Amino acid sequence: MFDLARQTRIILLLGIDVTFFFIEIITGYAIDSLALIADSFHMLNDIVSLLVALWATRLAHSTSHEPKYTYGWQRAEILGALSNGVFLIALCMFIFMEAIERFIEPPSVSNPTLMFFVGSLGLLSNFVGIFLFHDHGHDHPHTHTAQNYDFPEEDDIESVLPSTIVHRCNTSQQEVSHTHTQVADSATESSPLLSYTGNHNGAGTSKPVNNHGSIEQDAPKQTKKRNLNMHGVFLHVLGDALGNIGVISAALFIKYTDYSWRFLFDPCISILLTFIILFSAIPLCKSAALILLQVAPQSIKLDDVSNLINHLDGVESVHELHIWQLSDVKLIATVHVCVTLPDDKGESYTKLTTDIRNVLQSFGIYDVTIQPEFANHPLLCDQGSSS
């Protein structure tokens, strides 16, 4: 059991969730328990999340796509996450309106004993899920490429939904970290301007880059971090367990008390479950929307980046600096830089682009495009600054 692959564990959890979703929703309508119905919708959230996760994972691995999809399917998960969040909020509105109606005219739960047993079975299924994923809620050493930069957890969409975090766990299993090595020759004026660059910390290790200033950092580094992929699934399962505890509490309260208002406990638990769902759905929609709107991550201040680049030797001004997230794990930057260089433009410009990349890499940005504008053509710099 402990050696099960992560994707196998997710499929097992998906099968359990589907089974108990039908058990809870059928029983909930049969005995008129809104708490069971609400908890079944909470479980439906997990089902949709895991289905989107598996679908997006396969899309992310797919190399067959039309040429017009220049970034492939890397944003499929974000789109799925936003759809899932909107769907959850709509479900919460439905449950909330039903709960209000039951406060006005509280129906009697016909079989609290059955409600108790269904809630207990649901709790047992969640203990199985916690058993499958509990070892992924802790820190452990992990090798990754620098392109999979870990920016602060509060900015990471996977901290609120497993549908986007499972992708990283599966791709990390299949990625093979590798280092490209190359003889470090001195650059001359006859050398290609962007034929080499330094590594992340500015050392002299050479590395190939493409011809428009985009760098791919492949050297693996060892870090100690939580596996947020499976940790997110673990938190979701834990949330389901809390929902089942609420259902069990409502069943026991209705069965073993004789208060005239005891049936109000059922819609109270339903509203509590609604807030639990909204607690994950609203941050999910916000995070997904910010990525789709190409907003700069909260962890990066554009003024700080611009000031650091401006202080580099040879930089006259910086404009058109854009930083955004392609997905929850990949940052992209483009920048126009007005530069003043001595006569040996080839070597000086190569060093300057390396310095600019090192600045951006310090913020976790490894996909960089730099457009130079030379100060000996002031019209270009003036036009760029005013655009």
Swiss-Prot record:
GO molecular function: zinc ion sequestering activity; zinc ion transmembrane transporter activity
InterPro entries the record matches: Cation_efflux, Cation_efflux_CTD_sf, Cation_efflux_TMD_sf
GO biological process annotation, one example: detoxification of zinc ion
Ranges where the record places region Disordered: 195-221
Pfam families (alphabetical): Cation_efflux (PF01545)
Keyword Nucleus among UniProt keywords: yes
Bias (Polar residues) ranges: 195-214
Membrane topology: Multi-pass membrane protein
NCBIfam families membership: CDF (TIGR01297)
Name under which the protein is recorded: Zinc homeostasis factor 1
Species of provenance: Schizosaccharomyces pombe (strain 972 / ATCC 24843)
Gene name of this polypeptide: zhf1
